A protein has these predicted regions:
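Acidic, Mg2+-coordinating phosphoryl-transfer loop and its flanking beta/alpha structural elements
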Residues: 172-211
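Conserved H-loop
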Residues: 39, 110, 134-139, 167, ...
Length: 228
């Protein structure tokens, strides 16, 4: 596969890109609904709710709509319940996608700095990365509560670049969703989308990514180090 990207750093999304975390997210969301006396939802439906952080996932899972806002009291009860359940199951059924460890090893072997950039809260991010044996691959980790704005805003990507000491145009983002593409564009980074993830149930074809590839390993093979 011919290299198409030259970078000093690669910024990688977590859920849907590195790890299939849907089983545990769905378990926690349905446990939350059960606590509030609501019927369980199909996993595929919950999959469409993933990608914009815990608060949005809770609102969507409570209202069963993409743009819904649960009443404040219900939201607070729901979020507390979700966090409690997710802290107990985070990583239990989640799985690292095939080729991810090799992709990270290949990128590090090219002396490309790596950051994980996710909308997931930091406590859950570190818990999952550690359980999946991925944490040590990353020089920097930017979670959903580390910056004022989350993806699709560009701030998390810019913060990751700052932590790695690289300019945004020298970084390539790899993610699975529109959030990642919009955040990359806002920050001034190139972006590759992988087909392993969720993207709120929408097609990847019209996102405007620089490339769409099957897996993280395919993405890693497109990237070569930028000479210093």
């Amino acid at each position: 596969m011919t290299a198409r990207f030259v970078a000093r750093a690669v910024l990688i999304d977590l859920d849907g890109t590195l790890v299939d975390s849907l089983p545990d997210l769905a378990c926690a969301a349905n446990s939350m609904r059960a606590d509030l006396g609501l019927p369980l939802l199909p996993v595929d439906q919950i999959a469409s709710y993933v990608g914009k952080g815990v608060d949005v996932l809770v609102h969507r899972a409570l209202t069963e709509t993409m743009e819904g806002q649960a009443p404040p009291a219900a939201f607070q009860r729901g979020k507390q319940s979700f966090n409690r359940h997710y802290s107990q199951v985070n990583g239990n059924q989640s799985r690292v996608y095939p080729g991810v460890h090799q992709a990270l090893e290949d990128l590090r072997g090219k002396a490309i700095a790596l950051a994980c950039v996710t909308n997931k809260p930091r406590s859950f991010t570190l818990q999952l990365l550690e359980r999946m044996d991925l944490k040590m691959a990353f020089t920097a980790i930017v979670s959903g509560d580390d910056t004022e704005q989350k993806k699709p805003h560009g701030e998390p990507m810019l913060h990751a670049c700052q932590l790695l000491g690289v300019a945004a145009p020298d970084a390539t983002v790899i993610g699975d969703s529109e959030n990642d593409v919009l955040a990359a564009r806002a920050a001034g980074c190139q972006v590759i989308v992988v087909e392993t993830g969720y993207n709120e149930g929408k097609s990847l074809a019209n996102l405007g990514a620089d490339a769409i590839v099957p897996t993280l390993l395919h993405a890693a093979r497109l990237i070569e180090p930028r000479p210093h």
